[in-house]
Amino acid sequence: EVTVTLNGHNYSATTDAAGNWTLTVPVSDLAALGQANYTVSASATSAAGNTASSQANLLVDSGLPGVTINTVAGDDIINAAEAGAGQTISGQVTGAAAGDTVTVTLGGNTYTTTVQSNLSWSVTVPTADLQALGNGDLTITASVTNANGNTGSGSRDITIDANLPGLRVDTVAGDDIVNSIEHGQALVITGGSSGLNAGAVLTVTINSVAYSTTVQADGSWSVGIPAANVSAWPAGPLTVEVAGQSSAGNPVSVSHPFTVDLTAVAISINTVASDDVINAAEKGTDLTLSGSTSGIESGQTVTVTFGGKTYTASVAANGSWSVNVPAADLATLPDGAANVQASVSSASGNSASATHAYSVDASAPTLTINTIASDDILNAAEAGSPLTISGTSTAETGQTVTVTLNGATYSGNVQADGSWSVSVPPSALGALTTSNYTVSATVNDKAGNPGSASHNLAVDTTAPVLTINTVA
């Protein structure tokens, strides 16, 4: 057994045949850790009594970095001259370091930069990108991930008021990602315009297929993409291209990138309680449910349904996941067969689920010992022949019954009819003196639940004395 100590709490784990071990620290214990450096110590003692130990340092950094975005164009309103000159978007970060990457998104376009030594950052949005956005309200978002994997973000609302004719494409499929479910459905692409006449014809091109639509009185437009065409889109980056003419007859166009994510995702559930059977002892301690995923990003949420309750876990960097089921929840589980379900979705919305069967067997098997030697008394004649000790049990066929008499043990197996028996040889019976003995028997069912019984046996191997008085 391995004992692990973290923040004053001890946890136990058992090594497998290869010498590996693992354990789960409850969420409640992790939540109690402050942001600091901790020492994790582990020790183990072999069967021979030899002890080994090891330590590792653990940094807890659960604080999210912050990102701020400075005022854009002096007043968060980009006019015609400012749009024509391009704009620099800048800001500051906290909880991050120089060299960390800042990702900025504006109107479907993404720009990246690195944090400077004074924790500032900046990106340049070119004139062409600004003019393609057209007039209207927009939101700038910026995010940064620090060295410990914590991600923070910030946003800022701006307005483009440049009196520019232009077109805009709204977010595609809600997040600019078409997942495997959406890939099989019809899709509506929408957008807006300024400086175009109502009724102006627009050509929308996706994956080399052109669709025609018209501008509405409020400047909006939309086009429906049939499911057959959507399902023909290949995985990877695609672009919505929209082209038309302004009210002055000048050509206007816009491009909007999106992604088709058809990554196959999967989730699995490992064996429950090492053998898919929860016995009485296991029912009295916390249980770890675990499994693995593929095609799922680190940090995505796994939802587990077990015993009528729902638990959540996060996907680790290696695709694994685990949840802790408290003993209090296990205590309410009835005996019988059941299933555990787990489901997860990727960041793009592709989902997977799995079901795993297990059973609960927390009932101890019954065990009885029949009358021994027909009257529970072993006489001298019976002690000279093998003695059969027998009984019944509700343990499964083939389970081993261990019988102890006078310090010696004998083994038998449960038969199909529930009976069992062992034979005690005369050599062992001969060692019994005239006295009272206790015969004990034990058995474990396949789930590991123990059953036991005992029976009294009297040994009387002393021959009676017979005398004949003097005759006449």
Give residue ranges: language-model regions.
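Aromatic/hydrophobic beta-strand junction motif of beta-rich domains
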Residues: 1, 89-93, 189-193, 289-293, ...
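Short, acidic Ser/Thr/Gly-rich low-complexity loop/linker segments typical of extracellular
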Residues: 12-16, 112-116, 212-216, 312-316, ...
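Short strand-edge motifs at loop-to-beta-strand transitions and within beta-strands
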Residues: 19-23, 119-123, 219-223, 319-323, ...
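Surface-exposed, short loops/turns at beta-strand junctions within beta-sandwich domains
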Residues: 27-37, 127-137, 227-237, 327-337, ...
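Flexible, low-complexity linkers/stalks enriched in Thr/Pro that connect modular domains
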Residues: 54-70, 154-170, 254-270, 354-370, ...
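Short, solvent-exposed loop/linker segments at the N-terminal edge
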Residues: 75-85, 175-185, 275-285, 375-385, ...
